[in-house]
Amino acid sequence: MLNLFQIMNMINNDVPTPYGFYFQDSATPNQEGILELHDNIMFYLVVILGLVSWMLFTIVRTYSRNPMAYKYIKHGQTIEIIWKIFPAVILLTIAFPSFILLYLCDEVISPAMTIKAIGYQWYWKYEYFDFINDNGETIEFESYVIPDSLLEEGQLRLLDTDTSIVVPVDTHIRFIVTAADVIHDFAIPSLGIKVDGTPGRLNQVSTLIQREGVFYGMCSELCGIGHAQMPIKVEAVSLPKFLEWLNEQ
């Protein structure tokens, strides 16, 4: 039987779908901003494409009918001013929201907890800095892809892992990403997260998950023969369930 998280993933588009051509449903403010920016820019591009196509069609039709074309099509100060100012305005309209969103995505706002993700060839290791177990040690574990031969009904090939990142919803979370060998990339589409893991360097990204669910990601930097075996699985749960999970560690 499907568990609650699998049913939620069927309602919300939180997993890759065959022949999918659009984004997964957003679960964070950052991803919501990315979707809105994408849709706005696509609108501008469609308008520009239609305008340029109409101009090309009009010019070709005019020249084909009359080789001695209207003089202001070839030499006109007004049209030259228009096609310089109009594209500049469009670029500024696109650029300002992009810069604002880029700044907001890089901003880390008073994180309530920090998780360190370390990329190895070819698995992930996670460390919860803010919590310790009964032995006085930081909670940490490794995450490996589930082999095809061990997949159970409802699990996703090359996406499900033996252990998951468990986080509470409505909580500011900071991910610190690095790597131990080669460059990896920590990417989770539904959360709007994509940050490189570079050996000897710590990169950080902040997120605020707004709903419960299971979110999948992958290493998005070619890192060797086992690159496809580096999935990321995040389970967002309520705070009581998260505390219960912590007590089990």
From Swiss-Prot:
CDD domains: CcO_II_C
Keyword Electron transport found: yes
Top class in the EC scheme: translocase
Residues noted as binding Cu cation A1 in the record, renumbered to the chain: 184, 219, 223, 230
Cofactor(s) it depends on: Cu cation
Topology relative to the membrane: Multi-pass membrane protein
GO cellular component, one term: mitochondrial inner membrane
Record topological domains on the Mitochondrial matrix side: 63-80
GO terms for MF: copper ion binding; cytochrome-c oxidase activity
PTM notes: The signal sequence of COX2 is processed by IMP1.
Note on how the cofactor is bound: Binds a dinuclear copper A center per subunit.
Sorted UniProt keywords: Copper, Electron transport, Magnesium, Membrane, Metal-binding, Mitochondrion, Mitochondrion inner membrane, Respiratory chain, Signal, Translocase, Transmembrane, Transmembrane helix, Transport
Residues making up the signal peptide according to the UniProt record: 1-13
Keyword Transmembrane: yes
Binding-site residues for Cu cation A2, renumbered to this chain: 219, 221, 223, 227
GO terms for biological process, alphabetical: ATP synthesis coupled electron transport
Enzyme nomenclature, EC number: 7.1.1.9
Localization terms from the record: Mitochondrion inner membrane
Catalytic activity: 4 Fe(II)-[cytochrome c] + O2 + 8 H(+)(in) = 4 Fe(III)-[cytochrome c] + 2 H2O + 4 H(+)(out)
Stretches in topological domain Mitochondrial intermembrane: 14-40, 106-249
Subunit note: Component of the cytochrome c oxidase (complex IV, CIV), a multisubunit enzyme composed of a catalytic core of 3 subunits and several supernumerary subunits. The complex exists as a monomer or a dimer and forms supercomplexes (SCs) in the inner mitochondrial membrane with ubiquinol-cytochrome c oxidoreductase (cytochrome b-c1 complex, complex III, CIII).
Annotated family: Belongs to the cytochrome c oxidase subunit 2 family.
Protein task: Component of the cytochrome c oxidase, the last enzyme in the mitochondrial electron transport chain which drives oxidative phosphorylation. The respiratory chain contains 3 multisubunit complexes succinate dehydrogenase (complex II, CII), ubiquinol-cytochrome c oxidoreductase (cytochrome b-c1 complex, complex III, CIII) and cytochrome c oxidase (complex IV, CIV), that cooperate to transfer electrons derived from NADH and succinate to molecular oxygen, creating an electrochemical gradient over the inner membrane that drives transmembrane transport and the ATP synthase.
Stated name of the protein: Cytochrome c oxidase subunit 2
